């Protein structure tokens, strides 16, 4: 029996390698617009802009206190960034040697405010594509500290960086709090670590299977691990308490565990079915983020 249990552990550990590869290779989608129904005006307009005009994402660069000739040079550098289609500034309409003060007020006000000026950048890729986010990063590295990149694509890039930075932090906090709570209320301090190790391996295995979905939302990625930890930890605690009760009735620990599993099976299955049913209900939302979250969540729990 011991050799069989050890074999199962080794098999799980071996599966962690492809699971980690799958988790790393799963694309994370940060564009909430892609989950909108295709017949909404916003989506239709974006498709027309991309298909008929060859322009998808756009951003603005706000530049403070820079000489017009330096702005023109910066504009030229940005125009050579991959997937930048067009960079608009006032020198597209008037020579940069012409003082800004004598420009028509409509033209001046369109690009300037106080000592700040604005560049409008159009990309040939969609708002949240990987190519667009790489272009935003490249533009920021070129622009310098006195320049600020804004717009939806810049916000998506910031969101991506923020999520990647903070996700390990709040997952770690969830694990720490769960561990502390179990150590306080359980009579064995080793048990919480055993539970966390087992559930942690299950989470990694399930995250790897997301590769077969092609991509998942950043919200789904952020929530799925914590949800699985919370739900499956409850089932583990149910089983542990039942096992502790049965040990007082049966001398053989294996027999006590078998009885404990039988006693908790009905409640665990009933609880898991209602949980899975709730996740399946999300799949019927017209906003297909629900489908993404529901699919990942119920596959992780089943």
Predicted regions located by residue number:
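Single conserved hydrophobic/aromatic residue that forms the stacking wall/gate
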Residues: 1-6, 10, 300
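Hydrophobic transmembrane alpha-helices and their membrane-interface caps
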Residues: 172, 184, 189-239
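Helix-loop junctions and hydrophobic alpha-helical segments within the transmembrane domains
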Residues: 246-273
